[in-house]
Amino acid sequence: MIELTKNQLNSYSRQILDDYDSKNPSTIFKDKITISNEDAWRIQSTVTDLRKKRGEEVIGYKIGCVSKDTQLKMGFTKPAWGRLWKHELHSDGVTLEKSNYSNPAMEAEFGIVLNRYLTPELVNLDYILASIETIHSIIEIHNLVFNGNPPFGAELLANNAIHAGVVIGKSTKGNIQSQTTDLKLIFDKEIIDTWSDKKWPYDMVSERVVS
């Protein structure tokens, strides 16, 4: 696959940002363009630079497509990640307008706040656990829009892993050695999905460290 030229990279990145601002994501993929995952990463990074230049702030990262089945479906060989933006971080109890999103979808997740920057050469499960300041139940919001052809991995990456925001719950101190918990996603008082008997930290963290 031919690498994008600098002009193509800049053009696609500006269109991705314009689409984000107009709440109409991923219009460039309606033309069924084909780009590599590597170029999609470059687009995400270029859009990040544009957003930073206008005053937006990256506060963290999301990790997705952890399971091998999902990676295969998306055309990945490893998990995907995207940036978390300060103005898209919402507190528990917030009221959000559906009109600010495009085909919004939600996932119940666990999020962590780190107490230090991570040194890649030192990363293992024990190091990660010692680096956790607080643990939070969260709701991640996606703009669930794919206009291109499958697999959709490059489209997902170019659109910041289709991340559109996160609602963060109350904190729990991170020095938990072992605990079993449940996680539920409830919409209009109806349980949409549930995960029972999840063991912290192994069911939440170890797969991400190993991948």
Briefly describe each language-model feature range.
Residues 2-206:
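Catalytic-core "active-site belt" of small-molecule-metabolizing enzymes
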Residues 211:
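Glycine-rich phosphate/ribose-binding loops and adjacent secondary-structure elements
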